[in-house]
Design a protein with these regions (language model features):
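Structured loops at beta-to-helix junctions and adjacent beta-edge loops in soluble globular domains
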Residues: 2-4, 45, 97, 124, ...
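Compositionally biased, charged N-terminal/linker segments
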Residues: 1-38, 136-137, 146-148
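Short, charged beta-turn/beta-strand-edge "cap" motif at the junction between a beta-strand
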Residues: 45-52
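Aromatic- and Lys/Arg-enriched surface recognition patch
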Residues: 56-127
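A short secondary-structure junction signal
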Residues: 12-13, 70-71, 105-107, 140-143
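Charge/polar-rich, low-complexity and marginally structured segments
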Residues: 99, 123-144
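GIY-YIG nuclease signature motif recognition
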Residues: 1, 58-61, 133
Length: 148
């Protein structure tokens, strides 16, 4: 799950403990989020920064929540076409599990994995939520080492 550290970074999640992962306005990313289950782990990926990469780990606490920002005209992610009776956009509640000792950069990820193993490395990929195959996730966790 990608976020720009200036908008919401791993330090924000550490401080808050949990967060609503809201503001998803792409149907494919929304559908990936809908496929998550309570207890799933998610990598926290800092994007649009130098260097971008995997920095932390989160756990899914709640799923299928209605994204409140879609109804708020003052919110950045307001969607005037969204309807309270049939909302378009969901969010999930995520819990901070920890930060890795070192960020695993996009360049390092590209050297170690294929696009099939890790879709986030595909050039031009703008989705903020992407699945990671189980075997790749296990390998990443081993490479990244313990959380702190």
């Amino acid at each position: 799950m990608k976020s720009e550290p200036e908008a919401y970074g791993i330090d924000d999640l550490r401080r808050e403990g949990t967060t609503l992962w809201d503001g998803i306005r792409n149907y494919q990313a929304r559908n990936f989020m809908r496929s998550m289950a309570i207890g799933d782990q998610a990598f926290f990926y800092h994007s649009n920064c130098k260097p971008p990469g995997i920095i932390g780990l989160m756990e899914v606490e709640e799923i299928g929540l209605v994204d409140p920002t879609q109804f708020d005209p003052d919110a950045k992610y307001y969607d005037p076409k969204s309807n309270r009776d049939k909302p378009r956009w969901d969010c999930a509640r995520l819990r901070f599990l920890g930060e890795f000792q070192q960020l695993l950069s996009l360049d390092q990820l590209r050297q170690q994995y294929s696009e099939d193993q890790l879709p986030v490395i595909k050039r031009g990929n703008r989705l903020s939520i992407l699945p990671v195959p189980d075997a790749t996730a296990a390998d990443l966790l081993e490479r990244l080492g313990p959380l702190h």
